[in-house]
């Protein structure tokens, strides 16, 4: 989470947007595909930064049995309900005025599903959105594993 924050948030955040990183009390090591998890989270954060002009963006994770749930919540413009069920479809965008071609979230969905996980979104127009993934993982005791991720702020 710290890597995502440093790469995506530090240079792009305005005084109007607060970044919050939440994690459980205990640090957690898990065997995950670090490159792909980072790719998905960075896309969620980039979208949140793009659509949030004031308020906050919250990056969080929690451990649930043999899975990790990672989410990015924002207080941006939200997604219209008629477009909500299409946000993970290829070439779909919630807002035609924002730059991009609409494939980022479909790529995220594909990555998460290849890892055996699931992806979702909750949103309210003019109130914000929450994008989340739940991926299976195996806890490990140290960072020496090739694809391990240290889930900490």
Regions found by a protein language model. Give the residues of each.
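Short, small-residue-biased leader/transition segments that mark boundaries at the very start
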Residues: 1-5
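Short alpha-helical Gxxx[C/S/T] motif in the catalytic ATP-binding
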Residues: 104, 108
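Short helix-loop "hinge" at the ATP-lid/N-box region of the Bergerat-fold HATPase_c
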Residues: 48-49
